[in-house]
Amino acid sequence: PIGKSHPSLSADSGLQFPLDASTGKPIPFRCSGVGFGFRSRPVWEAMAQNPPPCTDLLIEHRCVFALSCMDKLVSHGKRLAMVNINATPCGRRGRNTDVKLDTLEIGKDAVVASVASDDQALRQHILDMGLTPGTEVTMMKYAPMGDPLEIRLRGYELTLRKDDAARIELVGIHDTDTGPRANAAIGTTEHPALGEGTYSPRAAKTAVPEGAPLHFALAGNQNCGKTTLFNQLTGSNQHVGNFPGVTVDRKDGTIRNHPEASVTDLPGIYSLSPYTGEEVVSRQFILDERPDAIIDIIDATNIERNLYLTLQLMELDRPMVIALNMMDEVTANGGAVDVNLLESLLGVPVVPISAARNEGIGELVDHALHVARFRERPGRLDFCAPDGPDGGALHRCIHGIANLIEDHAVTAHIPVRFAATKLVEGDELVTEALHLDRNELDAIEHIITQMEGEAGTDRLSALADMRFSFIGDVCGRCVVKPHESREHVRSVKIDRILTGRYTAIPAFLVIMGLVFWLTFGVIGAALQGLMEDGIAAIIASADAGLKAFGTNDVVRSLAVDGVLTGVGSVLTFLPIIVVLFLFLSILEDSGYMARVAFVMDKVLRRFGLSGRSFVPMLVGFGCTVPAIMSTRTLPSEHDRKMTVMLTPFMSCSAKLPVYGLLCGAFFPQATVPAMVSLYLIGIVVGCVAALVLNRTAFKGDPVPFIMELPNYRLPSVKTTVMLAWDKAKDFITKAFTIIFAATVVIWFLQTFDIRFNVVADQSQSLLAGLGSICLLYTSPSPR
């Protein structure tokens, strides 16, 4: 109550809200002692769970942060008065608002005060990842080479480089609270009429006829189980392609037992802001192809972060259902989610599932078909409170812009709320699509500038804060999070070795050495030998059969030496490709590949690359084809192109026989050292080429390294096998075409002479003639 200290506050951090007798409203508060609420998270959790019976004052973590760091009193969402905070803020003696994230000690907690960056797109991406002012972060560790660093926020781990972390100011530095915390119990909430056509007040009056084609978009964050869910939905009824105009993978499939329902697996993203190609592709797919419904998969172990994308998907105003994945982990760790209350607050159906265990998939499909047939759009599109801490400034801003651009948005087939929000963000793609004139653009900029002045913050921070505030309120009412999950505890223990300062690189060498040995020396080599024997037997049988049939020698040679030999040369690579991708899929699904990028980022950054490029180049020592194919997973076009151009410098296993032949001929006394030197020369030349390219064709700032580090998980056998098979099919359909065509061309050149007569002696063939021409320019001059 006003005028009283909350009982959960310690004696040295009493907080009082005196009442103004004339107005009946709170006046500037008094704070005594050190700590002021930041020292201990339970203080604010207790206040959230047991709020004071007072309607005049809204108490929130970020509200108190604003009071302590910006000297403002917030009540009814308005700044009533300026106050001086005499207490030492944030649990540390002396002023500490100049501390940067890159200098935070390991094991310390702090609160984000501000996020700065010259690159507004990068700054928005950082905010979208949850690093908003008022967010508590914990420094987990630094990479073995000192850069990048790993922090924990909003229940997950995030990595970023020191250069980017240096732009993030912190306050409230204190030791991490590792003690157990009691979880408040949540009840159950009845939700009426779900699945009966009356759930959403915005449903269509007439349903789509039974059996009519329906198309779904599957969206979600990275590492939330989206691929596993897609495989459960479609089984083997899927194919892989590209989104138009980009190299981003597109997976389409048909939902099992529902031949009329197809689904597209969109790339894993964290936001619909145009920071990455995947984000642009995902939102353009929804806007342009207008799927009948969106299936949004959420990691139930980290609802807070995942809901950030959910709110943006809801703004697209398409029928939608939420798949709350990994609920088995939540309950196993003592957590709980009031699913009915969650879907009531969001206005969309929520279905708890476990994709890995194939639990709840049938119910999810039923709900998805229902919202698609009845066109049940989200019941809520507005997430900013009119009486929020910013005084409703953002609410008025978005609604004012929405009224101004409504006609343009309808013409451009863009949802009005989504368009208004993106204009506040400064989204150039949406601005161009709306075709606004100069007067309208000036009016919109004036509205946004006025909002920034009233809210006391910039536009990007205001939007991110609005979404996370709504999410925090929702999660506070219907989610009980365990203090620490078993998966996270296990991951921390494993990371002590796999990302440890002195053990990370040796562990990496051991793991990749084992993968290469099993691929090229044991499993892959054995399967390749069996494949070669089988192909040789098929070619011999075909040759004998064609001879017995009396087939023309040229036709027989084309079939045997051209077609079958060409196909065989491709297929002999297949066992290596499958086994290598199988191991890489296991490492990726387990979460280890993200750690490799974290460990190696500092080395590759010197050459203009990020740590994600290390694994494709390493795979290049085994086989260049799968190495180049694996670059498609890199998030940056800059990284993809650079990695593709540098990977061939890593000598693959197919070059080993050639190296052996040349070294044996020219260096008979030192064959092994000569072969090793060829590998080293290739690496050195690749590094030099990277430096040259980074200063010429790919000149510019290095690509930021902002990446989530997921918990270690046991890979799904089904998902891993299907991923390896997809890569194998990709190899067959792409590399096969080139290699097969090259084989046929070589057969033609070595079979015919310049008059297109069949040659008995290949020294008279076209191929020999081309070799003679090359010899003129490559043979040493006579002494």
Q: Where on the chain are the PLM-derived regions?
A:
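Switch I (G2) and immediately adjacent beta-strands of P-loop GTPase domains
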Residues: 243-293
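Transmembrane helix-loop junctions at the membrane interface of multipass transporters and ion channels
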Residues: 653-675
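Conserved C-terminal guanine-recognition region of P-loop GTPase G domains, centered on the G4
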Residues: 285-289, 293, 297-349
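Alpha-helical membrane segments and immediately flanking helix-loop junctions
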Residues: 608-656, 663
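Juxtamembrane inter-helical linkers in multi-pass membrane proteins
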Residues: 537, 596-618, 700-722
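Conserved G1/Walker A P-loop phosphate-binding module
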Residues: 198-264
